[in-house]
Regions:
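Hydrophobic h-region of N-terminal signal peptides that target proteins for export
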Residues: 9-17, 235-237
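A short, hydrophobic C-terminal helix/tail in secreted or cell-surface proteins
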Residues: 221-239
Length: 247
């Protein structure tokens, strides 16, 4: 039993050590500003019932991922300037895709399809998604947290990261705890293209983007694999010993 507990402790410590939160752009507190994005109450003007929003993130912002890439399991957003708004609301039908793209910040095409990479994967939905501050499991400082249904493998060495959001059935008023933290600065690590109709093939290009906290599970480094290799035999030995009949 002692060996079994020790092995579990080693494995759990390794997993906790591997988890990382990468914020893009990291300097949003200096010169940042509130923006609406595709999730908040200001996303859709009156009589507009859907939206498509793409945002690109420069690959050099993901240096915190070990060599070889990692799995993105969720995204967090910071709410700023609450202004007495409601605590949250449900977007009836939301879909989020991620892909690796050759397009860079301030270089997105106004044609949505031209920005999408070959490894495109649906990571959320399409389904109802609750958007509110202080979501359980949120990264510190980023209260709106969306956990992915399917992780996305991303290797920064292969290109920039594209997030593609389809707000398919957005009501005219989506409650929110406030505006989202973002950055509207040419030459930074993010930019976007958007349209107020999810079916539009083209959109409006803008240098603005939402500050995003990515939760990443990197591929274990060789030292981590060594620890796991040592721990697994301990578990096997403990389980086998426990099953042996006592005289």
């Amino acid at each position: 039993m002692k060996h079994f507990c020790l092995a579990l402790l080693v494995i759990s410590s390794v997993m906790r050590a591997n988890a990382a939160v990468i914020v893009v752009p990291p300097d949003y507190n200096s010169g940042g500003e509130p923006i609406s994005g595709p999730f908040s109450q200001f996303s859709t003007p009156p009589n507009i019932t859907s939206m498509r929003y793409q945002e690109v993130y420069a690959s050099d912002q993901f240096s915190g991922i070990n060599h070889g890439g990692g799995f993105i399991t969720g995204v967090g957003y910071a709410i700023i300037g609450g202004g007495g708004l409601q605590p949250g609301g449900v977007i009836p039908k939301l879909q989020i895709d991620l892909s690796t793209t050759s397009k860079g910040p301030d270089g997105l095409s106004t044609v949505f399809a031209e920005n999408v990479g070959a490894d495109n994967r649906i990571v959320v939905g399409p389904k109802p998604v609750y958007i509110a501050a202080n979501t359980p499991g949120d990264p510190t400082g980023f209260g709106v947290f969306i956990r992915f249904d399917t992780p996305f493998f991303y290797d920064p060495a292969q290109g920039n990261l594209l997030m593609d959001v389809r707000n398919i059935e957005a009501p005219g008023f989506v409650q929110s705890a406030g505006s989202f933290a973002g950055l509207n600065k040419s030459g930074d690590s993010i930019s976007s293209v958007f349209a107020f109709n999810v079916g539009d093939a083209t959109g409006i290009r803008d240098t603005i983007g939402m500050t995003t906290a990515f939760v990443v599970e990197p591929i274990p480094e060789p030292s981590t694999i060594t620890l796991l290799t040592l721990a697994l035999p301990l578990i096997f030995f403990a389980v086998r010993r426990k099953r042996q009949p006592t005289n």
